[in-house]
């Protein structure tokens, strides 16, 4: 990796501000329901503790709309982090206020301070230079380890790096090396599976991946725009009318490049998107006009699984059907299973694909689950991520 990491600098005795991604889901009693993002940050935090740094952590949680809201406090996170680190975590009452400043100044080597939710300040998402400067003034060194927000140019992800030496943490290093290797130098066959609702969300990814992959497997709501572009009727399925021409161009380009561009051959259909409604499977050329396509069918699952099993590199981003509804989650679950049985390098983008892998207990059977949905998408598009771009080069 071309960027400096925490290994490349001396952190002993220094106050180190680490941007982590502790945006974890909680239930109504403020119990954390999935602590994966906290656990993913531990290697960097533990390295800093063991190397006698004074650790100051900054994160967002949810969307509190730029003002203080106790519902979005990071206090439950401090408690969980303390359990995982087996040591106290000091909680600041604010981000750049008096309490944060006093506690940051008083930190001893090996101690950990968690600042309150950085999005309690509207200046965070505006990347306000004054706010970034105040935040930077708490520390001597800045570490970005929040891949999940690396595609956002916010004060705590990009702004502070203007005022302090700035390096990557181990999680960002891991994300970049595994995904970077897959894109730059993949073992072949290289297969990408793209799902989700809209073609428009994935145009950049498809365009970039067509230059690199051997097979591209399409599922989810976006498949129906391609199916329509091939001249089939799609009933009441999701359609982006204004993207039909583009879908034709993409398929033509895949053909020219010799990419195996696969669309569903059968589909699960239902009259409405809710649990408990009758549903059936039809071939793709037999869609009734009053039904909605909600998932890939069994023949498609079989075809896609075969391609995945023989792949040496697989990247998956986006569900194959309406994953929130159990009856229409079969396709997504089957793809997750095929990935878990693939012997090659398997990379899962964040969001629903990651949730499917986690729920089914396949997390340790894939090479890498990205911690950032949006960030991993933009990385797959070949875009520059501002939170990484701004870090110091080696």
Curated annotation (Swiss-Prot):
An example Gene Ontology biological process: gluconeogenesis
Annotated EC: 2.7.2.3
Family annotation (PROSITE patterns): PGLYCERATE_KINASE
Primary location recorded for the protein, binned into one broad class: cytoplasm
Binding site for ATP: 202, 293, 324, 350-353
MF term (GO), any: phosphoglycerate kinase activity
Disulfide bonds: none
Gene Ontology cellular component annotations, sorted alphabetically: cytosol
Pfam families recorded: PGK (PF00162)
Binding site for substrate: 21-23, 37, 60-63, 119, 152
Subcellular compartments: Cytoplasm
Catalytic activity: (2R)-3-phosphoglycerate + ATP = (2R)-3-phospho-glyceroyl phosphate + ADP
Record keywords, A-Z: ATP-binding, Cytoplasm, Glycolysis, Kinase, Nucleotide-binding, Transferase
Pathway assigned in UniProt: Carbohydrate degradation; glycolysis; pyruvate from D-glyceraldehyde 3-phosphate: step 2/5
Subunit structure: Monomer.
Family membership noted in the UniProt record: Belongs to the phosphoglycerate kinase family.
Protein name (Swiss-Prot/TrEMBL): Phosphoglycerate kinase
Organism name: Caldanaerobacter subterraneus subsp. tengcongensis (strain DSM 15242 / JCM 11007 / NBRC 100824 / MB4) (Thermoanaerobacter tengcongensis)
């Amino acid at each position: 990796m071309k960027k400096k990491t925490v290994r490349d600098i001396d952190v002993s005795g220094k106050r180190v501000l680490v941007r982590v991604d502790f945006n974890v889901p909680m239930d109504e009693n403020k119990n954390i329901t999935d602590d994966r993002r906290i656990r993913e940050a531990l290697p960097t935090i533990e390295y800093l503790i063991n190397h006698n740094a004074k650790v100051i952590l900054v994160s967002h949680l949810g969307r509190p709309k730029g003002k203080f809201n106790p519902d979005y406090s990071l206090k439950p996170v401090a408690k969980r982090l303390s359990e995982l680190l087996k040591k106290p975590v000091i909680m600041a009452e604010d981000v750049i206020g008096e309490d944060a400043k006093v506690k940051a100044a008083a930190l001893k080597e090996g101690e950990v301070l968690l600042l309150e939710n950085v999005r309690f300040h509207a200046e965070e998402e505006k990347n306000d230079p004054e706010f970034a400067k105040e935040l930077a003034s708490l520390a001597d060194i800045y570490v970005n380890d929040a891949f999940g927000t690396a595609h956002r140019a916010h004060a705590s992800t990009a702004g502070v790096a203007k005022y302090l030496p700035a390096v990557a943490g181990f999680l960002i290093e891991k994300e970049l090396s595994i995904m970077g290797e897959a894109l730059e130098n993949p073992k072949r066959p290289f297969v990408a599976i793209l799902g989700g609702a809209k073609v428009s969300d994935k145009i950049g990814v498809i365009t970039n991946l067509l230059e690199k992959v051997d097979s591209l497997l399409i599922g989810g709501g976006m498949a129906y725009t391609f199916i329509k572009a091939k001249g089939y009727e799609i009933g009441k399925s999701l359609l982006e009318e204004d993207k039909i021409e583009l879908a034709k161009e993409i398929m033509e380009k895949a053909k020219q490049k010799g990419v195996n561009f696969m669309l569903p051959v059968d589909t699960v259909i239902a009259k409405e998107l809710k649990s408990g409604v009758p549903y059936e499977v039809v071939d793709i050329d037999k869609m009734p006009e009053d039904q909605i396509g909600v998932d890939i069918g069994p023949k498609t699952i079989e075809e896609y699984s075969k391609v995945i099993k023989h792949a040496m590199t697989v990247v998956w981003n986006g569900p194959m059907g309406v994953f929130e509804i159990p009856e229409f989650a079969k396709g997504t679950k089957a793809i997750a299973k095929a990935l878990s049985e693939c012997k090659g390098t398997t990379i899962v983008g964040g969001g629903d694909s990651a949730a499917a892998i986690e729920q089914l207990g396949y997390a340790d059977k894939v090479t890498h689950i990205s911690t950032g949905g949006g960030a991993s998408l933009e990385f797959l598009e070949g875009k520059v991520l501002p939170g990484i771009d701004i870090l110091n080069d080696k």
